[in-house]
């Protein structure tokens, strides 16, 4: 099995055991899409709280998610990404809930979402943005979840990895599209994926390049075509995440 197949098999088990929550009031914060459109002068940063990953193993198991998130916010991050997958990334919905309670900026639930139950749970925990990964979903399931998330007043970051998936995301009408430089089947990373797909971008969409960024020079490779980058591991390994995050905010 590939990494993605293994993760999705486990996710089916998790979701089957997950209760369907009643929808609660949504946390108040700004629209991430509107924020990106209003601040085009700099590459914006989505800074991630991630304890571990399937390919790298333990990254920072002792991290306090709230302290980490507050450091990111102080550095000027536009949004916090919180991994909520418990098995492969050692995250939890409680991490998301605690971060959302303690920062003012948007928080995205980073998980392999396959059910409306996960969307409701994420919203109730304080997420205002959710991730939908095209390679993890059929086109029909993607459309259904996108519509359900929109009905819940959640912004949706639709993740793609190749030209075919990019076309699907644009056809769907996604306003936030993330290009993952990581192949979810092999977990290999190549920033050139973002450089290549930028040739086929449509207008009025905000594009985020995800994974593989360690330096300002890395960010500079995609700064002309993208509105933001998502960075996790590089920040999680730093002793001073606030200083590290500030280094990654480059001009476009």
Swiss-Prot record:
Q: Which CDD domains match?
A: IGPS
Give the UniProt keywords, A-Z: Amino-acid biosynthesis, Aromatic amino acid biosynthesis, Decarboxylase, Lyase, Tryptophan biosynthesis
Q: What GO molecular function annotation could you give as one example from this UniProt entry?
A: indole-3-glycerol-phosphate synthase activity
Return the Pfam families for the record. IGPS
Task: Name the Gene Ontology biological process terms.
Answer: L-tryptophan biosynthetic process
Question: What class does this enzyme belong to in the EC scheme?
Answer: lyase
Catalysis: reaction(s) = 1-(2-carboxyphenylamino)-1-deoxy-D-ribulose 5-phosphate + H(+) = (1S,2R)-1-C-(indol-3-yl)glycerol 3-phosphate + CO2 + H2O
Q: In which pathway does it act?
A: Amino-acid biosynthesis; L-tryptophan biosynthesis; L-tryptophan from chorismate: step 4/5
Superkingdom as given in the UniProt entry: Bacteria
* Intrachain disulfide bonds: none
Give the enzyme's EC designation.
4.1.1.48
Q: Which HAMAP family match?
A: IGPS_B
Q: Which family does it belong to?
A: Belongs to the TrpC family.
Protein name per Swiss-Prot or TrEMBL: Indole-3-glycerol phosphate synthase
Q: Which organism is it from?
A: Listeria welshimeri serovar 6b (strain ATCC 35897 / DSM 20650 / CCUG 15529 / CIP 8149 / NCTC 11857 / SLCC 5334 / V8)
Report the gene name: trpC
């Amino acid at each position: 099995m590939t990494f993605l197949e293994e993760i999705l098999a486990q996710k089916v088990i998790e979701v089957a055991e997950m209760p369907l929550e009643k929808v609660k009031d949504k946390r108040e914060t700004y629209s991430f899409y509107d924020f990106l459109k209003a601040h085009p002068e700099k590459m914006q940063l989505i800074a991630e709280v991630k304890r571990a990953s399937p390919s790298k193993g333990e990254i920072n198991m002792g991290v306090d998610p709230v302290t980490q998130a507050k450091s990111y916010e102080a550095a000027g991050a536009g949004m916090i990404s919180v991994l909520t997958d418990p098995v492969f990334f050692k995250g939890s919905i409680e991490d998301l809930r605690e971060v959302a309670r303690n920062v003012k900026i948007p928080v995205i639930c980073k998980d392999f979402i396959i059910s409306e139950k996960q969307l409701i749970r994420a919203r109730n925990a304080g997420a205002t943005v959710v991730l939908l990964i095209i390679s993890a979903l059929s086109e029909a399931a993607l459309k259904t979840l996108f519509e359900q998330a929109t009905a819940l007043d959640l912004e949706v970051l639709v993740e793609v990895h190749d030209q075919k998936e990019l076309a699907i995301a644009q056809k769907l009408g996604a306003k936030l599209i993330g290009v993952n430089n990581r192949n979810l089947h092999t977990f290999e990373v190549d920033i050139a994926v973002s450089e290549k797909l930028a040739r086929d971008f449509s207008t009025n969409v905000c594009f985020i390049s995800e994974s593989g960024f360690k330096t300002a020079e890395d960010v500079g490779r995609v700064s002309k075509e993208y509105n933001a980058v998502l960075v996790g591991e590089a920040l999680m390994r730093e002793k001073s995440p606030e200083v590290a995050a500030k280094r990654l905010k480059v001009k476009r």
